[in-house]
């Protein structure tokens, strides 16, 4: 993103917290697809988040411009199970679709999800993402409510709000088309048109 702030931006919630989180609209659309699939099948779904972190004028920013589906995400005793095989697969797909991308967190969604990670998943996050300001997004597929958490101060701290932004994003668009074919995600005739129309309608509200 080369230290350029997105132009087409929509604020969601209270964004006074730090770091500031920006989520590209294709990614937000993909979250919705996974959430709808999770609600329909009553199984957890998840994704690794692709993005970058920046610092400007003493303020920290996180840009999430991609997401890779976590293969066969399972949950046992309240803990999400992400083994070495799943992690390796995520890294390989990140390299395939987002050549210079970095995995900076994860997203989970399921039916009637309690929007708090719990100590067992905080521990998992620290193992997978020890870096400061890595992100966990939790989305209840029942009511579509979501909460963002950031790894700082030795814990996962809830962030009160974030921004969504829209820009040309061929890498995520191509991944979504491929994912739709492989994983049976919600069908759309044109991923680009759907994301653009969704964002424009939200901005008008």
Give each language-model segment a name.
Residues 1-105, 111-195, 205:
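N-terminal beta-strand/alpha-helix entry module and adjacent surface
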